[in-house]
UniProtKB/Swiss-Prot annotation:
This is Ribulose bisphosphate carboxylase large chain. The gene is rbcL. Substrate binds at residues 113, 163, 167, 285, 317, 369. The modification N6,N6,N6-trimethyllysine is found at residue 4. It is found in: Plastid, Chloroplast. The modification N6-carboxylysine is found at residue 191. Mg(2+) binds at residues 191, 193-194. Keywords: Calvin cycle, Carbon dioxide fixation, Chloroplast, Disulfide bond, Lyase, Magnesium, Metal-binding, Methylation, Monooxygenase, Oxidoreductase, Photorespiration, Photosynthesis, Plastid. The basic functional RuBisCO is composed of a large chain homodimer in a 'head-to-tail' conformation. In form I RuBisCO this homodimer is arranged in a barrel-like tetramer with the small subunits forming a tetrameric 'cap' on each end of the 'barrel'. SUPFAM superfamilies: RuBisCo, C-terminal domain, RuBisCO, large subunit, small (N-terminal) domain. GO terms for cellular component: chloroplast. The lineage of its organism: Eukaryota, Viridiplantae, Streptophyta, Embryophyta, Tracheophyta. RuBisCO catalyzes two reactions: the carboxylation of D-ribulose 1,5-bisphosphate, the primary event in carbon dioxide fixation, as well as the oxidative fragmentation of the pentose substrate in the photorespiration process. Both reactions occur simultaneously and in competition at the same active site.
């Protein structure tokens, strides 16, 4: 076959509607908005080509490989209801295109280059199907839901957390004091804010030492296991590992990482260290909204959540449905299931485009955090269930009597909701009543109820189905 130079349509090679997907293929669903005049088949094929083996012109070296074996294929196109110029393109990638155990390589291939493509007005990766063969090359979460419950000896209820505020400006000693008060009052965890790393007003080593002291003091006084998410995120991987090692030497149960700003390579290294050394790993998703908030361009958070489960983390922030940050109920529940369950059935109503089998990859606890307070407790308990972490920053530290009473109020509200649920009451309908009853015998809860009775964050969600 002679080499024929020149430019040819992508769809001739990369649009293959008759293709039967293999169980080893990585499948992707893209929401494509082409430029005017670009037909859907060509746009879908262009996405498949540019994110796999293709380039803009025929190249001589194509003859040296078996393209049929390695090319991505656009195998199905479906219209988007209510959007004229938009459609979902399904692309299948052969497994051999990806390095084993590397989320970094997977994302570089699938979303690395194609989003700047001129023939498209916008492009959004809605979902990925990770084949079992690829999932098995990842360690996944350091410990997972089951082991975490056993390590903490806490069962049958959501865990309670609190982000220490003001997030920047406290000295290490005062920071540790706030940690102690919250844990002593009844919380399971406190948390470094995502941007607390090692700043001039509080260097990381001082913070780690004072927080460890707070943890041990609170444990001794309450007889419960306590933790503080020590943020190990740093400017270099070496510095990050140094912080993780120091945390292990202090004997604390859990550390934390900002996985998107820190990067997947750093995150996976840290997750491996955590498993090898018995540390739990809390993951914060700082920067996610830059990537996932626009409906037409970027990546849906469910893809970032899947990537995190592969890279490794025991907790991850997943929206609240009821607080101050973005998160529609169905969509949020869609990726909460995706984080916790072994097998998720394809279901388009919460936006699940593919069935996903995680085989034996451990589950991740979803964390609800952001603008939530005691009045939200019944809804949160009902929406997230026992395998979750509910995090109240201002909702603890904003209590009129101080941090410890704020923690007491949250713990009482939670225990009341769990008890009511276990007695068969309907949390969605009777939620306010349950909180009111509990506040009769808890002055701390009564004071919290009074402060936050009118607070709501109500704006329409940006990302709808």
């Amino acid at each position: 076959v002679g080499f024929k130079a020149g430019v040819k349509d992508y769809k001739l090679t990369y649009y293959t509607p008759e293709y039967e997907t293999k169980h080893t293929d990585i499948l992707a669903a893209f929401r494509v908005t082409p430029q005017p005049g670009v037909p859907p088949e060509e746009a879908g094929a262009a996405v498949a080509a540019e994110s796999s083996t293709g380039t803009w012109t025929t190249v001589w070296t194509d003859g040296l490989t078996n393209l049929d074996r390695y090319k991505g294929r656009c195998y199905h196109i479906e219209p988007v209801a209510g959007e004229e110029s938009q459609f979902i393109a399904y692309v299948a990638y052969p497994l051999d295109l990806f390095e084993e155990g590397s989320v970094t390589n997977m994302l570089t291939s699938i979303v690395g280059n194609v989003f700047g493509f001129k023939a498209l007005r916008s492009l959004r990766l809605e979902d990925l199907r990770i084949p079992v063969a690829y999932a098995k090359t990842f360690q996944g979460p350091p410990h997972g839901i089951q082991v975490e419950g056993d390590k903490l000896n806490k069962y049958g209820r959501p865990l309670l957390g609190c982000t220490i505020k003001p997030k920047l400006g406290l000295s290490a000693k005062n920071y540790g004091r706030a940690v102690y008060e919250c844990l002593r009052g009844g919380l399971d965890f406190t948390k470094d804010d995502e941007n607390v790393n090692s700043q001039p007003f509080m260097r990381w080593r001082d913070r780690f030492v004072f927080c460890a002291e707070a943890i041990y003091k609170a444990q001794a006084e309450t007889g419960e296991i306590k933790g503080h998410y020590l943020n190990a995120t740093a400017g270099t991987c070496e510095e990050m590992m140094k912080r993780a090692v120091f945390a292990r030497e202090l004997g604390v149960p859990i550390i934390m990482h900002d996985y998107l700003t820190g990067g997947f390579t750093a995150n996976t290294s840290l997750a491996h260290y955590c498993r090898d050394n018995g540390l739990l790993l809390h993951i914060h998703r700082a920067m996610h909204a830059v990537i996932d908030r626009q409906k037409n361009h970027g990546m849906h958070f469910r893809v970032l959540a899947k990537a995190l489960r592969m890279s490794g983390g025991d907790h991850i922030h997943a929206g609240t449905v009821v607080g101050k940050l973005e998160g529609e109920r169905d969509i949020t529940l869609g990726f909460v299931d995706l984080l916790r369950d072994d097998y998720i059935e394809k279901d388009r109503s919460p936006g699940i485009y593919f069935s996903q089998d995680w085989v034996s990859l451990a589950g991740v606890l979803p964390v609800a955090s952001g603008g939530i307070h005691v009045w939200h407790m019944p809804a949160l308990t009902e929406i997230f269930g026992d395998d979750s972490v509910l995090q109240f920053g201002g909702g603890t530290l904003g209590h009129p009597w101080g941090n410890a009473p704020g923690a007491v109020a949250n713990r009482v509200a939670l225990e009341a909701c769990v008890q009511a649920r276990n007695e068969g009451r309907d949390l969605a309908r009777e939620g306010n009543e349950i909180i009111r009853e509990a506040s009769k015998w808890s002055p701390e809860l009564a004071a919290a109820c009074e402060v936050w009775k009118e607070i709501k964050f109500e704006f329409p969600a940006m990302d709808t189905l």
